[in-house]
């Protein structure tokens, strides 16, 4: 059975600075705390941009604890700077990276990031992981669909919200229902974010895990006929913290099949559309 425990680490940047060198040490401390809280955690995810650097240190820590780690790293390649989320394997290797596709004006102007070019999914022993970096997932609807077409069974959404924070949960809920895939959405803790001469104070927080809430197909059927269920499987406030939940990907797959079969008459409409295009 594909059951996996995931941890969403809502980290506060050292000195209220996303690029602070001390973020690496803080990330390692939070990883250790995460494993101490629950040694059955298999995937730990940090927010977008966090800890900004520290690939070697994170790889060593992932290997020491034998877990998957997703971390926000600013990567330079061939003269270009990318907003990357790197997936470290439990053996300390880099299994892959997802570079953000949809860059806002802040990222282009202040950080000088270059957009990524492709979406990927990553195989693990419990299922395929997809990563939609911040607006890539909750903004353009095609990204979530493409991840599903690539076989994603669990989607992580490392994010950094210094605007639009209050609508994030609405957008995540829409994606979770549309795709019928569990989403682990991770923001920084709240801190005053300085951007040029401006300071954004309602910045960060509200990390959550959202996904199919039913325990069995009987509950799914009751929801279909009007029963109410809370899709938010857990959430944090604005302080630094760690959210841990167990997700059953086999059960989610069963619900997904039933959902698409009922609303469009086939298991995955986007896969069918892509096949029809040839």
Task: Explain the meaning of each model-derived region.
Residues 3-20, 45, 128-136, 156:
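Active-site-proximal beta-strand elements of phosphoester/diester hydrolases
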Residues 121, 189-278:
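C-terminal beta-strand edge segments of enzyme domains
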Residues 76-153, 159-174, 203, 224-231, ...:
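Active-site catalytic loop in hydrolytic enzyme cores
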Residues 8, 87, 97, 119-121, ...:
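Conserved hydrophobic/aromatic beta-strand scaffold that supports enzyme active sites
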Residues 14, 18-99, 161-181:
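Cys-nucleophile CN-hydrolase/nitrilase-fold catalytic domain and related Cys-dependent amidase chemistry
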């Amino acid at each position: 059975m594909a059951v996996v425990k995931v941890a969403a680490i809502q980290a506060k940047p050292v000195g209220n600075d996303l690029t602070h060198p001390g973020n690496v040490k803080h990330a390692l401390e939070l990883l250790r705390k995460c494993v101490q809280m629950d040694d059955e955690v298999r995937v730990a995810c940090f927010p977008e941009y966090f800890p900004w650097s520290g690939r070697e240190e994170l790889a060593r820590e992932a290997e020491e604890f034998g877990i998957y780690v997703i971390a926000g790293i600013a990567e330079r390649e061939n003269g270009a700077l990318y907003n990357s989320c790197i997936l470290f394997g439990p053996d300390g290797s880099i299994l892959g990276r997802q570079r953000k596709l949809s860059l806002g004006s802040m990222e282009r102007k202040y950080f000088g990031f270059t957009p990524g070019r492709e979406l990927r999914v990553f195989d693990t022993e419990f299922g395929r992981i997809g990563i939609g970096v911040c607006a890539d997932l909750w903004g353009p609807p095609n990204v979530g669909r493409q991840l599903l077409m690539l076989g994603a069974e669990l989607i992580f959404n490392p994010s950094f919200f210094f605007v639009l924070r209050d609508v994030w949960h609405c957008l995540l809920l829409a994606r979770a229902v549309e795709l019928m895939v569990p989403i682990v959405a991770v923001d920084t803790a709240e801190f005053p974010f300085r951007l040029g001469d401006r300071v954004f104070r309602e910045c960060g927080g509200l990390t959550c895990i959202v996904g199919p809430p039913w325990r069995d197909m009987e509950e799914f059927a009751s929801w279909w006929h009007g029963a109410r269920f809370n899709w938010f499987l857990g959430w944090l406030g604005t302080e630094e913290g760690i959210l841990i939940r167990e997700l059953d990907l086999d059960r989610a797959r069963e619900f997904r099949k039933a959902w698409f079969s009922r609303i469009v008459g086939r298991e995955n409409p986007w896969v069918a559309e892509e096949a029809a295009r040839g």
